[in-house]
Amino acid sequence: MEEGDVPKKSAADTPLLAYGRMKNREKDEGDLSLKKISPSPADFPISGSSSVFPAGRSSRRTPALMLQGTSSNAGKSILAAAYCRIFRQDGYNVAPFKAQNMSLNSGVTANGDEMSRAQIVQAQAARADPDARMNPILLKPHSDTGSQVVILGQPLGHMDVLEYFGKKRELWSAVTDSYDSLAAECDIVVLEGAGSPGEINLKSHDLVNMRMADYARASVLLVGDIDRGGLYASFLGTWMSFTDAERRLLTGYIVNRFRGDASLLGPAHEYMLDHTGTPVLGTIPYIRDLNIPEEDMAGFSWGHTDCGEKKAGTLDIAVVMLRHVSNYTDFAPLAAEPDIRLRPVRRAEEWGDPDVVMLPGSKSVVPDLDDLRRSGLADNILGHAERGKWIFGICGGLQILGRAILDPHGIESAAPEVPGLGLMDLRSTFAADKTLVRVARAETPLGVPSGGYEIHHGLTDHGPSALPLFLRADRAYPSEAERICGYVSGRRWATYLHGVFDDDTFRRTWIDHVRTDLGLTPQRRCLASYDLEKALDRLADVVRANSDMETIYRSMGLK
């Protein structure tokens, strides 16, 4: 086995996964009662009780560091990636782990399993192959109260909040089984929490923050975003919500995204040590132009309407921000290009006069299509197309651009058929089974390859005016029809490939193709490299230089 390879667990090893992979689920089985799941032998107590360790568990644990936050978007995901890379640079075999992630940004492993993009990036930082055990529970929200539940990389079904909480026992078993098998194969596990451990109303249902830290016996770093303000009050408030046992797990605080002279923070750090007995172990500066995908939209540099005026010679690209937008990381490589003005559009009044309109993926395509029509954005898109301008759709965006969306299984809508925008000769049908495919290489209309991954329920048929010019290069598919992953109709392009713009050569070739069509001079060379390896090394260098690594190692029983 090569370094970083992780053996795959079979469905039989995890009853929840076995249930999630059942292909014959009929609609009358949709209550997700998990009756086919063998119950856990013990109902593990919740965080805040004397112990969450199952009886008989060995006291020896793999050294573990856990990043928790005072809030969402505090920087946990990025810092977890930083410590993964630091430990790997120091010669340790590392695995990331997040028990439960609620995110619409996901990817596909080599084994065809779906997991959060954040843990995929962290795996790359650890130089390990992404493995669904690193993110055993993925929640993909489709409404304010419900999510699709993905267990160990396979869709289980849709649940509302109370139904999900009712499966705590089985879910906890899936989490701990995944953690134990992963931890047994590495030297250090870097865990990430979710949201904040100080959410008192959710604490009884916790399986991702302090309960997980307790199970892993992890050294916990509490991360806060000082750029938002109120950081030290957030540190104190979170600490006050902890039990004595939880406070003993807390090793230190990390001040994130600081701008200025760090010596000015000295009095605040002394106060934290005096009043909580826990030191600040890092002050991480605000890092500009990092170009590492963020977990939350709030962390994206281009995810704000006010992105400056368009400069001469640049392409103005408007990304239509659907209410249930997924995989907006698809556009991060474009944001790094100096001749691109990438901006989100959420309302018709933000439209402007874009050169290119991008329609991203969506977790709820039909409701988002309804939103586009109600908001007036559909009229903007149709007018843009009537003027012969460029449109690019990805995944759900592809389906929206077609003539019709069929939903015979009622996956998204009670309506069996909904008209699309009619801009491409495509008809998409939501299938009961989900397509999860990594595409190492795909042929494209530009004659240069790209790649990516597919995550969708839709199966698309095309008419004669939609040319199937995106094709999976893998000859394992017996027919050309099975290789199709995208279409072209003049200046209207659409593909199921997430990550299609990650490839530097394809991205620049496409940009220059559009520039030439608009009468702008093509650059004919890469102006920006979307190189995660260099970005991760840069991140690790900054975090290492601004963290008390000696204390962090010592807290894990290392060095």
Regions of interest found by a model, annotated:
Residues 3-4, 41:
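Cationic, amphipathic, low-complexity segments that mediate targeting or membrane/lipid association
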Residues 11-14, 18, 42, 55:
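Ala/Thr-enriched low-complexity intrinsically disordered regions
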Residues 13, 24, 28-31, 43:
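Intrinsic-disorder-associated, low-complexity terminal segments enriched in Asp/Asn/His/Tyr and depleted
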Residues 16-17, 32-34:
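Leucine-biased recognition of intrinsically disordered, low-complexity hydrophobic segments
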Residues 34-36, 43, 52-383, 390, ...:
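Flexible phosphate-sensing "switch/lid" loops adjacent to ATP/NTP-binding sites
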Residues 395:
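Catalytic nucleophile serine of serine hydrolases
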Residues 402-460:
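A conserved active-site-flanking secondary-structure segment within enzyme catalytic domains
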